């Protein structure tokens, strides 16, 4: 074949064997950075003002004036509860805290070196396997309540198991935060500790389309069940680039040991271009609005738990990072030492995060199910073009 048609085919064949040029490729957003994939009425992050609201309320105001139960109701229902609604909500939460013998047996059989996040993920899968209810909206609200109520019991059992201690049963006469602390330590600690813990739970409860929340919405978009969506979210949160930062913060502070070492430790890290955990945020560019509330909570806990050393290390690192890089702390930076002073094992910090974020995850799961569309993005192929299989290989 000769002439213009043959020439055109020759050019086409040549192009098919080469990767597309930059101009020919679509606009790829690695990590979906800057991509708006849906609407949500649950929370709003405004990077320009470093603000975060839940259903329109500033999170720092909620942390200062509300209980975690009130915030959970707000995230799920869209409005703060009346006194009567809160009483009924709390009654149902307290009635749902216990785990049965089969769950206790399952937790006891898990290896001692099992990652605490694997314990939480396995427990949620088991709850889903034994739940006979349908997956309609009303049932999902009840399932969300069950997970919120039972997760503290599971996390406390696992932490005590690792310490060689027997579990402590939930106390129906105590509020959410007091009950969890009692199940962990056998007593209700100082008011400053209870208050700081509850505030941390409110501050961690929800944060838009982060990786774990988006994972939950992706699973939900396939019309899978709520437990599968939460399990997917837990798997995402286990990853080092999403959860675990408050654990890393505390490991770093322990490595520093003395406030006098903090400045040189940080300078050496920066010289090696290593990431400093607890600083910076992909969304907030000029500071995390949750930090001042949690820093004050850390200071209160430090006062009653002899935590001046960690407060001093915090101050040195924060000041030096701001001076050297302009990067400010995120919520994980004050939460790490706060949880450590409360007495929690470092390995349990991220499971505690799950206890909080279960409210935000399930709010998003229910919102996704209400106006669902299968989440199915496209990809740009960059491998070999179609090839002929050789006769022998």
UniProtKB/Swiss-Prot annotation:
The catalysed reaction is:
propanoyl-CoA + oxaloacetate + H2O = (2S,3S)-2-methylcitrate + CoA + H(+); oxaloacetate + acetyl-CoA + H2O = citrate + CoA + H(+)
Q: What is its EC number?
A: 2.3.3.5, 2.3.3.16
The answer to whether UniProt assigns keyword Transferase to this entry is yes
* Keywords, comma-separated and alphabetical: Transferase, Tricarboxylic acid cycle
Q: Where is the signal peptide?
A: none
Phenotype reported upon loss of the gene: Cells lacking both prpC and prpD genes are unable to grow on propionate or cholesterol as the sole carbon source.
NCBIfam families of this UniProt entry? cit_synth_II, PRK14033.1
Outline what the protein does. Answer: Involved in the catabolism of short chain fatty acids (SCFA) via the tricarboxylic acid (TCA)(acetyl degradation route) and via the 2-methylcitrate cycle I (propionate degradation route). Catalyzes the Claisen condensation of propionyl-CoA and oxaloacetate (OAA) to yield 2-methylcitrate (2-MC) and CoA. Also catalyzes the condensation of oxaloacetate with acetyl-CoA.
Entry protein name: 2-methylcitrate synthase
The organism of origin for this protein: Mycobacterium tuberculosis (strain ATCC 25618 / H37Rv)
